[in-house]
């Protein structure tokens, strides 16, 4: 089988999802979600499954969308509440605030690391003239990239703060990826997207991007990534090669 490749004679920029692709945060997110949902679900429904429920309903989505999607899968509807709700209150915002506090407490205590294979791929791409972007649905996406010490490897960084300011819908809508391509001054067919979450892979497919790379996270299913639109599926970005180089733009 030939090596999976990013061909820089065809692709001139690469957009990376932050959580689970650039930063090793998926376990922390899943654990924070489980703690919050299990507290809420006690006496209402079965506990949150840290693999299946996380991957199917929450991973890759904006926080509040993830809450709505997961609770809908259990036949539960909550009032929206407001951004000043008490963390853990039985509202969409209340659960979201509790999850946010729990996750960021872990980050503040333990820090966050970047995946070495992703860092190596970023260096290879940039040495060959490709532009790069990091995209996150999280309000803390920028902080996570900075904490991992890799912000210098990206020309563009978009997170949940940008989405809120611009009123951009979350994945599986491709709006965040399309905004990244716009800021990179590239059209979608010139851009590859690397994502580990099913909504992100679907968003890249629906956005018409030139290459969609799915990374199989812990408990992930390669077949599902392909079904959602990944043209290349790998367990680790060390398996992705880079061919050619991006030629300088000429007037």
Please report, for each region that a protein language model flagged, where it lies by residue.
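N-terminal helical cap/lid subdomain that shapes the substrate entry/recognition surface
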Residues: 4-18, 22-116
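Short glycine/proline-centered loop/turn elements that form peptide/ligand docking sites
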Residues: 22, 119-120, 197-200, 215-224
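Conserved S-adenosyl-L-methionine
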Residues: 208-210
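Short acidic-hydrophobic, aromatic-tinged amphipathic segments that line or gate anion-handling sites
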Residues: 232-237
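Short amphipathic alpha-helix with an adjacent loop that forms part of the alpha/beta core around
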Residues: 5-6, 240-250
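Catalytic-core regions built around general acid/base machinery
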Residues: 117-128
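Substrate-recognition "cap/lid" segment bordering the active-site pocket of phosphatases
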Residues: 130-131, 135, 139-192, 198-202, ...
